[in-house]
Amino acid sequence: MTDLTTQEAIVLERPGKITLTNVSIPKISDPNEVIIQIKATGICGSDIHYYTHGRIANYVVESPMVLGHESSGIVALIGENVKTLKVGDRVALEPGIPDRFSPEMKEGRYNLDPNLKFAATPPFDGTLTKYYKTMKDFVYKLPDDVSFEEGALIEPLSVAIHANKLAKIKFGARCVVFGAGPIGLLAGKVASVFGAADVVFVDLLENKLETARQFGATHIVNSGDLPHGVTVDSVIKKAIGKKGADVVFECSGAEPCVRAGIEVCKAGGTIVQVGMGQEEIQFPISIIPTKELTFQGCFRYCQGDYSDSIELVSSRKLSLKPFITHRYSFKDAVEAFEETSHHPLNNIKTIIEGPE
């Protein structure tokens, strides 16, 4: 007899060990809740970091946790107060649920709510299951021309959208992106769509830089392969002008990149710090006031970012399909994590299909 109370899930048992494990199927307990049948989930760098290290900053995996937060699917069940969605709707889901009455929620900056419940961030389970329960306010209908795979990648795209909004990108802007990982690639691509004239990518790895070139980089700089005495900022300024960059997206979290970003940003320019690295680093703070730089933190996304991301993809101003390099069935998800963690250079985005 089929067990209708449990479902398979991809569970991080402890650092280095992921299993396919049975967990309870969620039930509606609040009239504003929605249950989604998950159809596609992207593997995020945070998933890999929890898998390999068991923690990110102060978020520590202390008990088994379902992984995954970049997901899309079909509405399977709705609470009685849900009027904007119906069973069968194709949707993307925002994985962070704030306190609906928090000051941050009222300000439209719910990503800063200290009580935010974010999928696959300890102690909260993620979306790599067949059915996942969330709140109606954080479920977005997908247009018919946006696939489930693209719907899953609305989540990282929203990070890039948020970063560009914080940067206040203007037409003709000169931008530099440090770190050519998925978020960096998307941040640069969005900057181009928003009207940036130059998008320079900086990374240590040549294959990542070649990928950045394929995604529209106007210039690439291999910071690990410069002649003795040549600095990153001097190479960038030679390419885009000696005044430097209007906007710097720091997407690596690495101290040398933070320092170089401060050097290369023009007077009056903006640095958007997207990457999270060591808790403490050293950088030339005196440059920030003397150049009147805006040093802007960026954390996930908030009001309007998901909707704008879906519109950008649906309008075909930006395609997410080229970012998908690997696909796995749900039953092969453990292999997907092992492959992604052991061979990251061959991967931009891995998609895991939802369970059958």
Swiss-Prot record:
It catalyses: xylitol + NAD(+) = D-xylulose + NADH + H(+). This is D-xylulose reductase. CDD domains: sorbitol_DH. One of its GO terms (molecular function) is zinc ion binding. Its cofactor is Zn(2+). Zn(2+) binds at residues 44, 69, 155. Disulfide bonds: none annotated. Gene3D superfamilies: Medium-chain alcohol dehydrogenases, catalytic domain (3.90.180.10), NAD(P)-binding Rossmann-like Domain (3.40.50.720). It comes from the Eukaryota. Binds 1 zinc ion per subunit. It comes from Saccharomyces cerevisiae (strain ATCC 204508 / S288c). GO terms for biological process: D-xylose metabolic process; L-arabinose catabolic process to xylulose 5-phosphate; sorbitol catabolic process; xylulose biosynthetic process. Belongs to the zinc-containing alcohol dehydrogenase family. NAD(+) binds at residues 179-184. PANTHER family: SORBITOL DEHYDROGENASE. The keyword Ubl conjugation does not apply. It holds the Pfam family ADH_N. The lineage of its organism: Eukaryota, Fungi, Dikarya, Ascomycota, Saccharomycotina. Its EC number is 1.1.1.9. Keywords: Carbohydrate metabolism, Metal-binding, NAD, Oxidoreductase, Xylose metabolism, Zinc. Pathway: Carbohydrate degradation; L-arabinose degradation via L-arabinitol; D-xylulose 5-phosphate from L-arabinose (fungal route): step 4/5. InterPro entries: ADH-like_C, ADH-like_N, ADH_Zn_CS, GroES-like_sf, NAD(P)-bd_dom_sf, PKS_ER, SDH-like. The gene is XYL2. Induction: By xylose. The keyword Cytoplasm does not apply. PROSITE patterns: ADH_ZINC.
